[in-house]
UniProtKB/Swiss-Prot annotation:
Residues 24-507 are extracellular. Glycans are attached at residues 49, 229, 256, 289, 432, 445, 464. The chain crosses the membrane at residues 508-528. PROSITE patterns: PROTEIN_KINASE_ATP, PROTEIN_KINASE_DOM, PROTEIN_KINASE_ST. Residues 1-23 form the signal peptide. The modification Phosphothreonine is found at residues 551, 718, 723. The active site is at residue 684. This is Probable LRR receptor-like serine/threonine-protein kinase At1g07550. One of its GO terms (cellular component) is membrane.
Amino acid sequence: MDTCTRLLFAACATLSILHLVQSQNQQGFISLDCGLASNESPYNEANSNLTYISDADFIQGGKTGNVQKDLLMKLRKPYTVLRYFPDGIRNCYSLNVKQDTNYLIRVMFRYGNYDGLNNSPRFDLYLGPNIWTTIDMGKSGDGVLEEIIHITRSNILDICLVKTGTSTPMISSIELRPLLYDTYIAQTGSLRNYNRFYFTDSNNYIRYPQDVHDRIWVPLILPEWTHINTSHHVIDSIDGYDPPQDVLRTGAMPANASDPMTITWNLKTATDQVYGYIYIAEIMEVQANETREFEVVVNNKVHFDPFRPTRFEAQVMFNNVPLTCEGGFCRLQLIKTPKSTLPPLMNAFEIFTGIEFPQSETNQNDVIAVKNIQASYGLNRISWQGDPCVPKQFLWTGLSCNVIDVSTPPRIVKLDLSSSGLNGVIPPSIQNLTQLQELDLSQNNLTGKVPEFLAKMKYLLVINLSGNKLSGLVPQALLDRKKEGLKLLVDENMICVSCGTRFPTAAVAASVSAVAIIILVLVLIFVLRRRKPSAGKVTRSSFKSENRRFTYSDVNKMTNNFQVVIGKGGFGVVYQGCLNNEQAAIKVLSHSSAQGYKEFKTEVELLLRVHHEKLVSLIGYCDDDNGLALIYELMGKGNLKEHLSGKPGCSVLSWPIRLKIALESAIGIEYLHTGCKPKIVHRDVKSTNILLSEEFEAKIADFGLSRSFLIGNEAQPTVVAGTFGYLDPEYHKTSLLSMKSDVYSFGVVLLEIISGQDVIDLSRENCNIVEWTSFILENGDIESIVDPNLHQDYDTSSAWKVVELAMSCVNRTSKERPNMSQVVHVLNECLETCEKWRKSQEVDLSSPLELSIVVDTEINPKAR
C-alpha cells in the first residue's frame, strides 16, 4: 500500500493566532458533568478551569449517583458524580452541534461502586445510529475513556448508552472540542484515539489550558531512551494542530546513538487501520559539524524521505493513507541515516485507528420535525430518544420509516400518535415530514380546525383524525384529495364535512335516530355472539386437548411464585419451574407482548399434535382469565445464540459440537417440512430459537409464527413475519412464503455457527453477516470466517463444506436453495468427515466432499 506523506511547515500564521485566541476562551466547547445537580451548574473545574454544566437538559431520563466516598479525594470533580439508566434499553444525549464540523468527542465512565454492588457494568456505546464500542468496566478497570475525532453530519449529535445485559449503563462526562476542518482527517470514516504520548520524565498529564484543543497528553519515557528538554520557545508552525509548548519543549532520543528509536504497540483488532501523527522539533544545540537526519520506518517499511528537524520549530508527520500491522503488532522506528552523526529524536506521538459509522442518520428535516411535534405535545416516551428510525431495533414507537440502504438517510413515512392523550391543535411542524404517507392522530383531545396544509402533503395516503374535538369545516382542498383516493377519517368530531352551513335540525334528528338504530343493532350482535361464538373468532375453548391444561394457580406453584427468571423474549418472561419432580421452563405471556393470543394458540395447537425428538416438547399450557403460559421441558444450556456470543458462563462450542447442533437443528426443521401433515413452515428460525440441553442436544423452539401448508409445496401469500437479518429477502419482497424461507433463515444460522459473528453488526463495513461472508469469500479466506475462539482447532474440509452449504441456503433466489433434506444430508457428511479428523488428524482429509446441490457461482467460495 502506498502511503501519502506530508510535512506541514509555517503557513497562515495570522489565522493560527486567531484560532488560538478563540480556542483559549472555550468557544464551541461542550463540557457536561453527567449527574450534576442543576443548581450546582455551571462551575469551573479547579485544575483546568474548564466550565462544566449539568447534563439534565440534554437527556430525557436516568438517575444520579455518587462514587463511593473513599474515591472522592482522588478524582477531579466531573468524575465524582454520574448518571445511570435503570429504565429502557437505549438512553441518548442529544447535543446541538455545527454540521460538517470536525469534533474531538470524549466520553468518560467512572463506576466508583456508586451502587455498592461491586458489579462493573457492561453495555454498548452508540454515536447516532452506529455502534461506537462496547464499554466493559470489568475488563478496563474502574475508569474507561473513549475518544474519537468525527465530522458531524447534521446539527444534532446523539450519544447513546444501550443496555445489552443485566448491568446498568452509566456515564460520568461528555466533552466536545471543535477542531479545524482539515486536521485529523481519515481516508474514510472517523478516527478513534488509541493513545497520545509526549516524551518526558515527568508524571504530569497535559490538557487544557496548555492544550488549546483540550487533548490529553500522556507522559512516556522508556529505559532505553534519553530524556531531553529546553526552556527555549519552540515555534509552532503547524497550522491547526497547535501542540502545547510543554509538549514541544521536551523529547527523547535513544541512549545509544547508533540505535533506532523504537515504539511498539498491539492493536485491539488485528485488522485495524492505523493513523500516526509524529511531532518533531530540534530542541538541542546542534554544532556545525553535527547532523541529525533519520528515516521513519513503520513495520520495516520506510514511509518518509530522510528528514532533518528544524531548530526550535515544530513539524508534524502523518499518513493520509491508513496502515495495517500484521497480526495487530505495530512497530514505529526512527532510524538515523549514514549521513547522520546524531541519533533520531521525537517529541510526541499520536496513534489513531480508523472507525466506520456507516449507517446514515435519519433525514435531518424529519428529525427536527418529529422533535418539534414531540415538544408541541410534551410527549415523554422512553423510546423517543436518539435517531428516530435506525437502528431498526430502536425505531421510535408510532413511527414507520423508509430505510433504503446505510448510505441513504431514512425517511419517516408513518406517524401514529393515536390514543396518546394529546391536547391542543394539530401542529404545523407535521407538514415538514414531507415523505409522510400515513398520519394517525385519532382518539385524542385535539381542538381547533383541520389544517389546510395537510392537503399539500403530496405523499399522504391516510389521515385519521377521528375521536377528537376538532371543529369547523374540512378544507375543500382536503376533500378534493379524498376524491383522488386519500383515506380521510374525521368522525367523532364537531366537524362539517361539506362546505356551507352547519347540519340542519332535521339532519340532526335523523342522525340521532340513525345512532339509536346502530346501537340497537350492536346490542343484538353482542347478545348473539354471547350465545354462539363466530367461526372466525379465536376462542379459548377451541383447543382439542384439555388433559395438559393447567390453571394460573398451578403455574404460580410450579414457579414458586415466579421466583427464578431464566429468559425474556417477545412473548414475555420465562421462569424456571418444577412439575412432578421434573424441571420445566414456563413462558408467561406479558400483557404488553407484541405477540399475543393468536400466536399462543398457534404454538399450543401445533405442539399438541406435533412430536419429534428435535422439537422442544410442550408439557402443558395455561389458558384462563388470569393469564397465559406455555410449559416446556427445560433445556439446561439455554439457547445457541448465548454460546456463540460469548455470554458470561457459556462455554466456547467446539467445532464437532457446532456441527452436531447444526445437524440436529436441521433434522427438526426437516421434520416440520416433510414429516408433518399438513406441512409446516416455522417462519422464525434463528439461533435464539435453537435450545440446548445439558448434553448440548439441539431442539427447535418457538412456533408462534408457524404456518401450515394445506396445499402442496408451492409458495403461498401471507403477511410477512420473522426476524430482521434472518428474513428471506424474496419472501419479504413478494409476501410469498415457502419451505425455502426456512432454508434461508437456517443458512444465516449456519453462518453464525461457523463464525460466531452477530447477524447484524453495524461496526462492520458489511454489517449483514451474509454480505460480510460473501466479501471475505472473494479472497477464499476461510480462516477469517471461522470463529477465532476456536483457535484454528477445526477441520478445514468440513468447515469449507459448511460454508458452501450456508451460502447456497442464503441464495437470494429461493429455487436455487437446497431443501432441508439435502441440508441434512450434507451436514451428515460434514459430521462424518469431522469425526474422522478428530479421531486421527494424521489421516489425509484434504480431498473435500463435493456439494451435491447447485450453488450460486457469485457467492461460491473460490479457494480452499
